[in-house]
A protein has these predicted regions:
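C-terminal alpha-helix plus adjacent terminal tail
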Residues: 2-131
Length: 131
């Protein structure tokens, strides 16, 4: 393999399957914009796609969902340095949230996979630290 160099990969590579996300591209573009509250509202009207997103986020921390939506919104107008700084400051804030410790407990400590997260917070607390 070493003698063949990168061309050895051609003989070993498998054809790529179609992306599982590709079929949802239009719905992703339509649904995932704005605040988490806006996204949730659009999920209700998104049929099978909305049901799948709800299934995949059922055990997610409400604060993480709200914060992620705010981060994406803020970073849409930032350059790379500003986006990375937003990631840093939001990460610092999130690691101090009770939901972070609860998620660690549920997944890594007790391994019961049954977190008891706080109710969905206001997005303002995250907007205050983002550029």
């Amino acid at each position: 393999l070493i003698d063949e160099g990168v061309t050895a990969l051609d003989a070993l590579a498998l054809p790529a399957d179609e992306s599982g996300l590709a079929r949802w591209y239009e719905q992703i573009e339509e649904v995932f914009a704005g605040s988490w509250a806006e996204i949730e509202g659009r999920l209700d009207a998104a049929g099978e796609f909305g049901a799948k997103v709800r299934e995949l986020t059922a055990q997610a921390s409400p604060s993480a969902l709200v914060a992620a939506a705010e981060l994406f919104h803020a970073n849409a107008t930032q350059d790379l340095a500003g986006s990375l700084d937003n990631e840093r400051v939001l990460g610092e804030l999130m690691r101090g949230e009770p939901d972070f410790a609860e998620g660690v407990r549920a997944v890594l400590v007790d391994k019961d996979q049954a977190p008891s997260f706080a109710p969905q917070p206001s997005p303002e607390k995250y907007r205050e630290v983002l550029k």
